[in-house]
Amino acid sequence: MASSTLSPVTQLCSSKSGLSSVSQCLLVKPMKINSHGLGKDKRMKVKCMATSIPADDRVPDMEKRNLMNLLLLGALSLPTAGMLVPYGTFFVPPGSGGGSGGTPAKDALGNDVIASEWLKTHPPGNRTLTQGLKGDPTYLVVENDGTLATYGINAVCTHLGCVVPFNAAENKFICPCHGSQYNNQGRVVRGPAPLSLALAHADIDDGKVVFVPWVETDFRTGEDPWWA
């Protein structure tokens, strides 16, 4: 006596998380031949092999990895840079622009940078991160004579976009990702980075530091700004 086998069917299985996954089920009705040659039915058996896909695997995790890399980079590079400002603070949506068309510089707490107060706590030669144009981490520079430089230095490496810490001991910016180096004004002196760090004007408006896009000649290279 021939046995009957049903074709595989597709079943929607539910997981504990409420998500569903497709599984293939095979329904078989086996026959058993006894000593008298008679067929005896057994219960219908259903074998279901489900392949569940975790929810996290369904969502691209590139953004999550990038964010964690940025935060980790900041934590690892702080001892090298000798700074107390966590880089993660600066990866927030940029604030509204100032009335003059510039972007107010923000400190690690998100407060406006008051030039006179900044100079009281940052000595000559200091380079400290603030939030600049488009929310980019940007260094405010204190000149050797104790005045605030009229330019800010974008901290994003021109190689692959890592945040570059300032190494005060060597008086230059050194990227921890692939070893690119820039002098204390952000001009590239060693690859693989192909270009110098971008600049922004650092103006003072009503006592506050304001960043304005730099579209003039790059004073470090004598060339047009590649970022404009």
Swiss-Prot record:
Residues 115-211 form the Rieske domain. Disulfide bonds join C162-C177. This protein is 1 of 2 subunits of the cytochrome b6-f complex that are encoded in the nucleus. The Rieske iron-sulfur protein is a high potential 2Fe-2S protein. It is found in: Plastid, Chloroplast thylakoid membrane. Binds 1 [2Fe-2S] cluster per subunit. Its EC number is 7.1.1.6. It comes from Nicotiana tabacum (Common tobacco). It catalyses: 2 oxidized [plastocyanin] + a plastoquinol + 2 H(+)(in) = 2 reduced [plastocyanin] + a plastoquinone + 4 H(+)(out). [2Fe-2S] cluster binds at C157, H159, C175, H178. Belongs to the Rieske iron-sulfur protein family. This is Cytochrome b6-f complex iron-sulfur subunit 1, chloroplastic. Residues 1-49 form a transit peptide. The keyword RNA-binding does not apply. GO terms for molecular function: 2 iron, 2 sulfur cluster binding; electron transporter, transferring electrons within cytochrome b6/f complex of photosystem II activity; metal ion binding; oxidoreductase activity; plastoquinol--plastocyanin reductase activity. GO terms for cellular component: chloroplast thylakoid membrane; plasma membrane. Keywords: 2Fe-2S, Chloroplast, Disulfide bond, Electron transport, Iron, Iron-sulfur, Membrane, Metal-binding, Plastid, Thylakoid, Transit peptide, Translocase, Transmembrane, Transmembrane helix, Transport.
